């Protein structure tokens, strides 16, 4: 069975414009909602904690090793003049990873089913995220 590192945001100081809490709060709620599905499908996972940072989460995943996938749950902020007007979901993957692209496409397809603006869900190749060692 697959093993993933589940990494919801640790940015407590990034409040949502809607007043619904911080990025850390909301992304941890999303991770909480994912856990039953992971358990139900036999997917093993390790999860970071809110007192960690992005860097320490990546370091822990690298130190523990053996993960098939690193799932970072984050929301992006907008510049003050765009605050509250930018929407959508970006699913990032490493450009030369066929399996990473396939996983990103699967996530995006399922997110389109539940996101209120499915046309704003897309996959994006990138090399500019936190550096993690290649899984397995």
What are these regions (language model features)?
Residues 19-23:
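Periplasmic OmpA-like peptidoglycan-binding domain that tethers envelope proteins to the cell wall
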Residues 2-4, 12-14, 25-136:
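Active-site-proximal helix/loop segments of hydrolytic enzymes
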């Amino acid at each position: 069975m697959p093993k993933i590192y589940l990494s919801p945001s640790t940015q407590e100081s990034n409040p949502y414009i809607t007043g619904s809490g911080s990025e850390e709060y909301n992304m941890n709620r999303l991770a909480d909602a994912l856990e039953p599905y992971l358990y139900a499908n036999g997917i093993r996972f390790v999860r970071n904690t809110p007192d960690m940072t992005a860097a320490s989460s990546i370091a822990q995943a690298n130190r523990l090793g053996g993960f098939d996938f690193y799932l970072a749950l984050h929301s992006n902020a907008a510049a003050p003049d765009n605050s509250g007007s930018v929407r959508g979901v970006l699913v990032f993957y490493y450009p030369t990873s066929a399996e990473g692209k396939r996983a990103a496409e699967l996530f995006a397809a399922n997110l389109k089913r539940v996101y209120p603006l499915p046309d704003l869900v897309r996959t994006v190749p990138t090399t500019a995220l936190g550096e993690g060692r290649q899984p397995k």
